[in-house]
Amino acid sequence: MGERKQPVKTAVAAASEELMVVQTMGGRMQVRWDETAQATPHGQLVFFAEFLAAAGVFERWVDACPLHYTSPNASGKRDVLGTLMLGVLAGSRRYAHIAGVRGDAVAAQALGLKGIVSEDSVRRALKAMAPESSEPWMRDALLHSVRDSLERPWVLDLDATIKPLYGRQEGAEVGYNPHKPGRPSHVLHTFWVGNLRLVLDAVLTSGKQHTSRHGKAPLRRLLDELGDKAPALVRGDCGYGNEDMLDICEQRGLPYLFRLRQTKNVKRLIERLFRREDWTRASEATQGWQAIEDSIRLVGWSQARRVIVLRRRMKQDTALTAKQDDGQLVLALPHDAVEDNAQLWEYTVLVTNAPYEIAAIGQLYRDRCDCENGFDELKNQWGWGGFSTHDMHRSQITARAVALVYNWWSWYVRAANPGARREALTSRPLLLAAVGRATSHAGQTTLYLTPMHANTGLIKTMVANVHAAIRYVRQAAEQLPQLDRWAALLRYICQRIVGPSALPTPPPALAAPG
């Protein structure tokens, strides 16, 4: 059998080396396979690699990795982590997708790897790390990627997202899953830096552990680790407006803003406040919302707390429906005259101890929806929806690893374009994709880049902005050898984002003597 198969293999190999003639719609083309050329579809990765090298964060991540092999034939931890990072950058959602970058020798050289390892090597490497050592390693790396940017007042957003599962994974339980009811899932309790849309931590739990009480311990731990970089406001939706979360913030003296569930007592409060005349005026600035302030002590609360009730008049031509006893869906307001005269209101009740005016509270809470855009990007444009294994341990590592690469890439994109944030769907074609061909001569490597994007001028401008940031850090490091380069880089980028601060008003001049 082996003798019969050998000629077939030889014929296939010979055919792959022959010149092929292809008749295309644009004419005749000659095609030849070239598996030895140093080429990459991610030519601009070299600029991102320089960004990481100047800050030293990738080296720090690799050096702190608890992976240790005893076999001399095993892959190095730098190769494993570099392969995982490259796969995440390229948009991989599963371990098998890493095979798509396996032959990228140019990327391997840019990241200082001996070679790109297989997806099985990545799986086995993550499994070889004990949870008690990998947990603090990844938490520290994730917090380090953001912490030095928290010198200005910032908002901590709390939220959880559902990760549907399609296999027999550990912790795959049927719980709250609004998009795919009945589908087993995991839950990612996530802690965001508001507006910057950066991840401070992500904790993976089973599908039934979706409530806020499963995020209490991670929140306490995160606030302890932040120390003097604590947020100016802790913000969350209705799942976090309970005594436990409020008590955590109040014990630390942190302002908070949470939405309340519309329980019976909350509805009674709405009915009582509806008749009051001191509602704020609806305007374009408030997006049609009116607000009023009061206090309430709900069941289970240790004290009465300040609440802000928001209401907005709903648009006309709204159809109300109801179900009959037989389950038939009917209109609750069948007559047009009744429907036209009805005034329908939408209500939101917020609990807060923040010392802000009523008019500002509503917009401050509406800004929270920006973290939903972060979830959408991480799940659909990065790898948070995938990289699933039978054990939760590796899924937790990859969830934090994806968030870490996402944070690094976000800083890189903001260095390139400080004026606006770009999601991966637009930033990758601009700042990662380019056909690169490497040539080596006399110990020097030259990379020729051919961008496929139409805005080549914009790309060059953005790369120049990145080089300006790197040049700033290098010049500062020459004068201060002990400088924290990553902290200096983040301060530079944040300064570019917010713009120059206003100069303080000089004190009045003293009167002349005599």
Describe the function of each predicted region:
Residues E3-R4, A15-V31, P255-G374, N380, ...:
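An anionic, glycine-rich sequence signature occurring as long contiguous blocks
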Residues M1-E225, C249, G436-G514:
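Dynamic "connector" segments at or just before major functional cores
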Residues P231-G241:
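Acidic/histidine-rich, metal-coordinating catalytic segments
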Residues C65-P72, I358-Y365, Q381-I397, Y412-L425, ...:
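Short, solvent-exposed helix-loop connector elements
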Residues F51, I98, G288, I358-A401, ...:
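Short amphipathic alpha-helical "interface-anchor" segments enriched in bulky aromatics
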Residues G227, L246-P255:
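Short, surface-exposed basic-aromatic patches at helix termini and helix-loop junctions that form
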Residues V106-A108, K163-L165, L198, Q209, ...:
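Flexible loop/turn segments at secondary-structure boundaries
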